[in-house]
Amino acid sequence: MRGQSTATPIDVATVRSWLGDGGETAFIDVREEGQHGAGHPLLVPRVVILDPEITRDTPEWLWASTGIRALDHAVERFYTPTHQPLTDVLCIEAIRLLVRELPVTMHTPGDLDARLACQLAAWFSLFGAFNARTGLSHAIGHQLGGRCGVPHGQTSCVILPHVMLFNAPAAADRLAVIGEAAGVMTEGKSTEDAAKAATKTVARAIKALGCPTRLTEVGVTEADLHPIAQATFDELRPGMNPRRVHDPDEILEILKAAL
């Protein structure tokens, strides 16, 4: 449904205390099952303030899981078919910073330099949001969030490694570069092996942060999987994901593996 507001515009400024994208981009209605987006230039903040001092009181689970959400943004925008040179550079730097600095912020919460590095990485991961599109991990996350009430950071923690593995046959070269940014020693490895190593490295990083890694940990049951798979398939559009998804059953297999 489209409409045109006639209200007097109000400038928006946001101060983000976590690492997700809500401070810059998201206006979503989740009062009903699923998600409904609202978009207008006047909704875009004129100013976004990144102050690591403000994040000191952010709950650890929220900080860590939204950090993985930012990693999900960067990974999916790097291997999307619509990737661009500018977004490639920013996404790889985001991956490098998040994998290196996010654990530091958990072990040494007072390290403001590490916190700022994570904030910058999350910002980098959002560039080109409407050109370099996200793929299957985000599509599944939308349904898990809207239908099952799972916070988006936690959907990324559970789903991203499984989607990376699914996409490996179609995006091994890009996943190998992601692996290098994440600290994988790729010398002597085939592209396919480097891609698998990238997936394992991301999965280990998520587990080391203490984030959930199974759907059952976030309240999703086997009975939820079929409708989520169908709704995810309905959301996907050509060019969103590096590997084509032919039917909902392929998504269902990913969900079962993550259960």
Where are these regions (language model features)?
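Flexible, polar/low-complexity N-terminal or interdomain linker segments that lie immediately upstream
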Residues: 1-40
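Internal, well-ordered alpha-helical segments in soluble enzyme and binding-protein domains
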Residues: 11, 48, 63-70, 91-94, ...
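A glycine/threonine-rich phosphate-anchoring loop and its flanking beta-alpha core
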Residues: 21, 38, 43-83, 176-181
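Structural motif
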Residues: 26, 47-48, 69, 126, ...
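Fold-independent oxyanion-binding glycine-rich loops
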Residues: 30, 50-53, 58, 121-122, ...
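Buried hydrophobic positions in well-ordered alpha/beta secondary-structure cores of metabolic enzymes
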Residues: 51, 71, 118, 138, ...
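Active-site segments that bind and position negatively charged phosphate/pyrophosphate groups
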Residues: 77-201
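C-terminal charged capping/lid subdomain of soluble metabolic enzymes
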Residues: 175, 186-259
